[in-house]
Amino acid sequence: MSHFSTIKTQLKEVEPLIKALNHFGYSINQEEKFVKGYKGQFTAVDISMHLPGDTQVGFKWDKNSNSYELVTDLDLWKFEIPVERFISKVTQMYAYQTIISKTQEDGYQIVEQKNKNDGSIELVLTKWEN
C-alpha cells in the first residue's frame, strides 16, 4: 500500500526555491495545489510539480519548523535519481540562488564561478566602493 511521505528540508523562502526548481527545468504547476498518490489519493501542497517519469512532488509550508517540506508518494517515485539526491540538488541550487540574491542586494558582482568535480560551486565576488 502506498502513502504520502513528508521529508523535512531547510528551505525557508519561496523565491529561491522556485528559482532553484526552474533552474533544473522542473515545471511548477501554479494551478494545482495538490499532489496525487496511490489510487487517486490527493494531499494539499503549496507548490506542486511533475517530474519526468510521471512523478508528482510538492512542497508544503510547515509552520512548526518554519520551512518547506517535500511531499510525494515514494512508492510512485519513478524519477531517474533517488529522492535524497533530488533534495540535495534542489537544496544546493536554493543556497546558490539565495547567495546570489543577497550579494547582489549588497552590491556585489560575480567575478568568477567554478563548478567543481565534487559537485560544489565556487564563487568569487567583488564589490566596488565609490
Regions found by a protein language model. Name each.
Residues 1-130:
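Interaction-mediating elements
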